[in-house]
Amino acid sequence: MDLSKLTTEARNKRTMNLDRMTIHEFATIMNQEDQSVPLSVANSLATIENAIDSITKHFKQGGRLFYIGAGTSGRLGVLDAVECVPTFGIEAEMVRGLIAGGPSAMTLAVEGAEDDDKLASSDLKKRALTAADVVVGIAASGRTPYVIGGLDYADSLGAATISLACNQNSEISKHAQIAIEVPVGPEILTGSTRLKAGTAQKLVLNMLSTGAMVGIGKVYKNLMVDVRPTNEKLLIRSKRIICQATNCDEATAAEVFEKADRNVKLAIVMILTNLPKKEANEQLRKADGFISKTIPE
């Protein structure tokens, strides 16, 4: 394995004296390096847009989204996946994050897991992957065997495949139908890809999941109308969203929220259309979940 050609493994010329910097110097240089990350992501927007479009189309056909990765890359996939459940009110199976080595690898490194190119296919088989699904392989280096094996298995079934790497001309790009490459350059701490590379990956994953959820009607204007009120904060937010979407007062929001069985989206449609719950729910069904399509012009 030759790591010398990977920019994520190169030494950063700006931080050769990192161990002798003052805290102010360290914080300043790290902040400056981090500012380059969104610009790198911006250079890949066209490919990211293609990926969002693909995920959205598969969601509309009942497909699922799987993130696969090892180490930090895998953890970021799991993080994005689990947040989709309360944010967009989806079932946990719709977006899943798989990490090399299984759940225990979220907190402890599992030796050899990322180098096993058969492990991801086994993980995906357990989830009954089909051609209707999408697999996003995440690897900062762009050469992780676990990810490559998973992408190849997905492709063999006819599933959509997307890769996300932080090096140009990466190996995993050759194994995906849509290849996202966000080269962030050398880290301030050589080879520590949890830094700029991890930040870039998180930014892209945010775009993939959020963009696709917008595309299937999980958002009204810029409000998360399918949020699940699973705690006190989200309960308060749910009522606030109803007020913001309909310009109603808090008392009305609270009343209709309960009538709608604490379904934010349904409550909004009931208020905007002045329909009772059953009819409002039917309007939402006909509109494929898009609130904007239920409102008379």
Swiss-Prot record:
Additional notes on this entry: A lyase-type mechanism (elimination/hydration) is suggested for the cleavage of the lactyl ether bond of MurNAc 6-phosphate, with the formation of an alpha,beta-unsaturated aldehyde intermediate with (E)-stereochemistry, followed by the syn addition of water to give product.
Taxonomic placement: Bacteria, Bacillati, Bacillota, Bacilli, Lactobacillales
Organism: Oenococcus oeni (strain ATCC BAA-331 / PSU-1)
Subunit note: Homodimer.
GO MF, one example: carbon-oxygen lyase activity
Function: Specifically catalyzes the cleavage of the D-lactyl ether substituent of MurNAc 6-phosphate, producing GlcNAc 6-phosphate and D-lactate.
HAMAP family: MurQ
Active site per UniProt: 83, 114
Signal peptide: none
Keywords (A to Z) from UniProt: Carbohydrate metabolism, Lyase
Protein name as annotated: N-acetylmuramic acid 6-phosphate etherase
GO-annotated biological processes: amino sugar catabolic process; N-acetylmuramic acid catabolic process; peptidoglycan turnover
Family affiliation: Belongs to the GCKR-like family. MurNAc-6-P etherase subfamily.
